């Protein structure tokens, strides 16, 4: 039975996220694994509306936005050496990694 490894990456900055994805894909390809992806998942966008003044001027508001970018990588035919190489990768700060085996 073949195992699939799904790696889901999340970050606020899409450039840092894409660099991390490229680093993971290169490592897996060097180890001889088969890579599907990176698959861009929907970006989550959160918007907050805040009053500029603490007491009055209801019409004066300011909007703040936060975007969470996501990517999915599927790895098939991963060897133990590939998994060991993935464990040794140091990713930049601000990138959240979620790994699932199926």
Swiss-Prot record:
One of its GO terms (biological process) is translation. Pfam families: Ribosomal_S10. SMART domains: Ribosomal_S10 (SM01403). One of its GO terms (molecular function) is tRNA binding. GO terms for cellular component: ribonucleoprotein complex; ribosome. It comes from the Bacteria. The keyword Cytoplasm does not apply. Keywords: Ribonucleoprotein, Ribosomal protein. Involved in the binding of tRNA to the ribosomes. Part of the 30S ribosomal subunit. Belongs to the universal ribosomal protein uS10 family. This is Small ribosomal subunit protein uS10.
